[in-house]
Design a protein with these regions (language model features):
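Short, Lys/Arg-rich, polar N-terminal cytosolic tail immediately upstream
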Residues: 23-45
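C-terminal ends of transmembrane helices
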Residues: 39, 92-106, 148-156, 199-207
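Short, amphipathic, aromatic/basic-enriched membrane-interface segments that mark the entry/exit
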Residues: 44-53, 106-113, 131-137, 154-163
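Selected alpha-helical membrane-embedding segments in polytopic membrane proteins
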Residues: 53-112, 117-118
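Hydrophobic alpha-helical transmembrane segments and adjacent interfacial helices
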Residues: 58-69, 119-129, 150-151, 169-180
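Membrane-proximal helix-loop-helix units in multi-pass membrane proteins
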Residues: 120-170
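Terminal transmembrane helical module of multi-pass membrane proteins
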Residues: 161-216
């Protein structure tokens, strides 16, 4: 029996279990797990484990921090807004420089990727609404939203390090929301530095997994 796997590509396999009555029946739940693991592996390969996106986001936060010091919080917000819009294009550009394969059209995690963009816009709206009240609190609240957003990346990429990244940003946002003068720097600098650190960790883990796969 020929079965077409729904990955978006013409990948046909001979299902020997269906043809052999002595073989145990297929377990749909187990096959679903295999499919989701393949989808996650495809995302990791296409986006280097998500490291370029985290790197681009870190640059956006650092650019906003520079704008905050030079021109003020309002310019920092618009810098972060523009930088946020450029995260995906820059991440894709970096991926193409590494000649990464594209995600297949049938990948079930593609929709999750689009859904993960919505909190970004929600966070920007929340931050914009809080700007007249407190610039520090506005950026801290946005950091909280971004931290929560990263939690979904653990499912998208099959990478638990995103739980740690989300928790760190959530802690940073909470700390600066409670105590804006906690450190002699803006929350934008701390968030940007944290994202660049995790981007390096994510890229290192992805590169190590590629090396293991090549050696196997």
């Amino acid at each position: 029996v020929l079965r077409c796997w729904s990955s978006g590509s013409a990948d046909f396999r001979l299902d020997r279990r269906a043809a052999d009555p002595h073989k145990p029946p297929r377990n749909p739940a187990q096959e679903a797990v295999i499919d989701i693991q393949h989808a996650q592996a495809e995302f990791r390969a296409a986006y280097q484990g998500g490291a370029p996106g985290v790197f681009a986001s870190g640059l956006a936060w650092l650019a906003a921090d520079a704008a905050w010091y030079v021109w003020g919080g309002l310019y920092a917000f618009f810098t972060l807004f523009i930088g946020g819009m450029l995260i995906m294009p820059l991440a894709l550009l970096i991926a193409r420089l590494f000649r990464a394969p594209k995600v297949s059209k049938g990948n079930p995690l593609t929709l999750l990727g689009f859904e993960a963009v919505l909190p970004l816009f929600a966070g920007l709206l929340i931050a914009w609404g809080l700007m007249p009240v407190s610039e520090s609190f506005a950026f801290a609240a946005f950091a909280l939203v971004i931290g929560a957003r990263y939690l979904s990346f653990a499912t998208m990429y099959g990478e638990r390090l995103y739980w740690a990244l989300g928790a760190v940003l959530f802690a940073i946002g909470t700390a600066f929301a409670i105590r804006p003068d906690l450190l002699p720097v803006h929350v934008t600098l701390v968030v940007g530095a944290a994202e660049l650190l995790f981007a390096a960790l994510l890229f290192t883990r992805w590169n190590a997994s590629i090396a293991r796969s090549a050696a196997a």
